[in-house]
Structures are given as structure tokens and as C-alpha cells.
């Protein structure tokens, strides 16, 4: 049943309508498509362009991301977030001088943004061709942090068991035969992982996701073959076709067999019991409703929010699918078109 978005629901609906980072990270491709539709209706919306740039970054489409970030800055020159995203793309395209200039401009607008400071440092190090020294504590972290991996017919999935990491503190780069990950740990130390992969992957279809309990890296296989190990020089003459393991017991970096189903269950239980407050709790609730819903539920939610300007939330497709959803703001608010 359609209902006016009031109180917590109104807050949640605003989070959805603004395409928050957390929602985009759930499914960057779906968010990209929705933002493209939204921009058809509101072609001068700077935040929409900025968030679509984030979608492109997560999908590895850096040239498209730069274009959207620039458009966002044309509409709102004072957006430090748009400058951050433009700079990240320039950095990944190895245009370090331009990236440094962009990050510096963003820092002038928001000197308290730690992400801009960190990226400025990375650019300076890249320009100088220097690598930061590895401290003793950093080497200790490197030895303690473990990763596991498993595979499906279409993907190889690596999970870094690192908790409470901010998404902007994680940088993952894919190439056809290599994976490189750099993580700024909560302690302030860096963790790096570099792998020479056994078989090729499709970099542009490989992604990563930062969760509160782990970092999940998904590498797209070009063909459905079984990886006998994660690293190597491609010295397997005749790769075997992929056949799923019955018990889901997969190889890991620590060279012993792990019951992945049990591990995933433990992580999901920990995520489920995580205590969130305020907007974070509302955001998680809204993500859960959307991710667990059927295709009809998702269509109903998208249609009702877009047509009502974010004032109505409905999961009933049989109702909203056959009519235009009218604007219906909460009793204590007045709708204004800008």
C-alpha cells in the first residue's frame, strides 16, 4: 500500500532519492541506470552527476566518471566531493599532475576532508616515484591479515578479513593478470596485496565492495574454467572446466581447506547484529527492503519515488504500476519545485 513518506520513512526515502554512496555500492550498475533515468527528468541536477561519477568509478569507467564529475562541477563549482571523484579518475589514468591540482582545489573548499589529504600524498609520491617506507608495525599487520578466496563458474572472489575500513581508504586496481590492493587500516598503517594471477580476468568487469566486516573483491573470469590455485604464471596447459564443489570447500591463501559456507554465515550474523543509529540505521533498513524485494517491489519503489519527488514510498507494483504517483509531502512540510 502506498503511504506518504513521513518521519523515519521520509528520511529513508530522501536517502534513496539522493542515491547515497551505500546504495550505489550495493549495485553500481543498477544505480548507474537509475541515475541516468533520473537525469533525463532533471538534467541540471549536480548531485546526480556526482553520484553517477561514483558509479562509473566503481565500474572502472574512469573517462565517463571524469565527464560526469566535470558536469557536476559546472552546475556546482563548490562541490569538494565532485573534485575528489574527478581527481581519483585522473589518478587512476596516471595523470598525476592533473589529479594533484584537482585534489588541491578540493582541499581549498574542504580543508577537513581526510580523503583529499590522503590522495594529495599519493599523487606526490607517484610524481616523485617514491614508495613509502614499510614500518615494523606495518610489516606486523601484513603478516597478521589473512585473505581467503573461492570461485564460482564466472568469478574468483577474494575476501580480505579487515574490519571497520572506510571505502575511500581502499584502492583496488585490476589488470588482465594482476591484482593490486592498498588499504589504509584504522591504525593508520597501510596493508598492500599484490597478486600475479594464474589465469586472465576481465578488469573492466571486476569490482570490489567495502563492508564493515570485510573487503570483498570479485574478479570476472573470461571463461568458465577451474582455477587450481590463485597465483601462477599461467602454466596450466589444459585448464579444466568449472564444476562446483558439492561441499563448498575452497582453497585459501593460507594453504588449508576452509568451510566457506560456515565463514560466510558467521560474517552475515555479525553484520546482522551490528548496531547502527540514526541515518546509518535507516539507510541499512532501506537497503534491506530494496535488496530483499522482488523485481516488482523494486520497480514500485523506484517509480513511486521518482514520480512523487521522493515523498511517497510504495512496494505495491499492482497499485503504482497503473497510475502516476502524485506528490504527497508530510503534513509538516510543503512541496516546492526548484
From Swiss-Prot:
Domain CS: 142-231
Swiss-Prot/TrEMBL TPR repeat ranges: 11-45, 46-79, 80-113
Subcellular location(s) of the protein: Cytoplasm; Nucleus
GO cellular component, as recorded: cytoplasm; nucleus
Residues with N-acetylalanine modification: 2
Post-translational note: Phosphorylated at Ser-254 and Ser-304, dephosphorylation promotes nuclear translocation, most likely due to disruption of the SUGT1-HSP90 complex.
Record cross-link Glycyl lysine isopeptide (Lys-Gly) (interchain with G-Cter in SUMO2), residues: 268
Example GO BP: kinetochore assembly
Record-annotated SGS domain positions: 249-338
Phosphoserine modifications at: 254, 304
InterPro entries per record: CS_dom, HSP20-like_chaperone, SGS_dom, Sgt1-like, TPR-like_helical_dom_sf, TPR_rpt
Numbered residues of crosslink Glycyl lysine isopeptide (Lys-Gly) (interchain with G-Cter in SUMO1): 268
Residue positions, PTM Phosphothreonine: 257
Gene3D superfamilies: 2.60.40.790, Tetratricopeptide repeat domain (1.25.40.10)
TM spans (from-to): none
Alphabetized GO MF terms: protein-folding chaperone binding
Domain of life, per lineage: Eukaryota
Swiss-Prot/TrEMBL keywords: Acetylation, Cytoplasm, Isopeptide bond, Nucleus, Phosphoprotein, Repeat, TPR repeat, Ubl conjugation, Ubl conjugation pathway
One matching Pfam family: SGS
Family of the protein in this entry: Belongs to the SGT1 family.
Entry function: May play a role in ubiquitination and subsequent proteasomal degradation of target proteins.
Domain notes: The CS domain mediates interaction with HSP90.
Descriptive protein name: Protein SGT1 homolog
Amino acid at each position: 500500500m502506498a503511504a506518504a513518506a513521513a518521519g523515519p520513512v521520509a528520511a529513508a526515502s530522501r536517502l534513496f532519492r539522493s542515491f547515497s554512496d551505500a546504495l550505489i555500492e550495493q549495485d553500481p550498475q543498477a544505480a548507474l541506470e537509475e541515475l541516468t533515468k533520473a537525469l533525463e527528468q532533471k538534467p541540471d541536477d549536480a548531485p546526480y552527476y556526482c553520484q553517477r561519477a561514483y558509479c562509473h568509478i566503481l565500474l572502472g569507467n574512469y573517462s565517463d566518471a571524469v565527464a560526469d564529475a566535470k558536469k557536476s562541477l559546472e552546475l556546482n563549482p563548490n562541490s569538494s566531493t565532485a573534485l575528489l571523484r574527478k581527481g581519483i579518475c585522473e589518478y587512476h589514468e596516471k595523470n598525476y599532475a592533473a589529479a594533484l591540482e584537482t585534489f588541491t582545489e578540493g582541499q581549498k573548499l574542504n580543508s577537513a576532508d581526510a580523503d583529499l589529504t590522503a590522495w594529495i600524498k599519493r599523487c606526490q609520491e607517484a610524481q616523485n616515484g617514491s614508495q613509502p617506507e614499510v614500518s615494523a608495525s606495518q610489516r606486523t599487520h601484513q603478516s597478521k591479515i589473512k585473505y581467503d578466496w573461492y570461485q564460482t563458474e564466472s568469478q574468483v572472489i577474494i575476501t580480505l578479513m579487515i574490519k571497520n575500513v572506510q571505502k575511500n581508504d581502499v584502492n583496488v586496481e585490476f589488470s588482465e593478470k594482476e591484482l593490486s590492493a592498498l588499504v589504509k587500516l584504522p591504525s593508520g598503517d597501510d596493508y598492500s596485496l599484490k597478486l600475479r594471477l594464474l589465469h586472465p580476468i576481465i578488469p573492466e568487469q571486476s569490482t570490489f565492495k567495502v563492508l564493515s566486516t570485510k573487503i570483498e573483491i570479485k574478479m570476472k573470469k573470461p571463461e568458465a574454467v577451474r582455477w587450481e590455485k590463485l597465483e601462477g604464471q599461467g602454466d596450466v596447459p589444459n585448464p579444466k572446466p568449472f564444476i562446483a564443489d558439492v561441499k563448498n570447500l575452497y582453497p585459501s591463501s593460507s594453504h588449508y581447506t576452509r568451510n566457506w559456507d560456515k565463514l560466510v554465515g558467521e560474517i552475515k550474523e555479525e553484520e546482522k547484529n551490528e548496531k547502527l543509529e540514526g541515518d546509518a540505521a535507516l539507510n541499512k533498513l532501506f537497503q534491506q527492503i530494496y535488496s530483499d524485494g522482488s523485481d516488482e517491489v523494486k520497480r514500485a519503489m523506484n517509480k513511486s519515488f521518482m514520480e512523487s519527488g521522493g515523498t511517497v514510498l510504495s512496494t505495491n507494483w499492482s497499485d503504482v504500476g497503473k497510475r502516476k504517483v502524485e506528490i504527497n509531502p508530510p503534513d509538516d512540510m510543503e512541496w516546492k519545485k526548484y
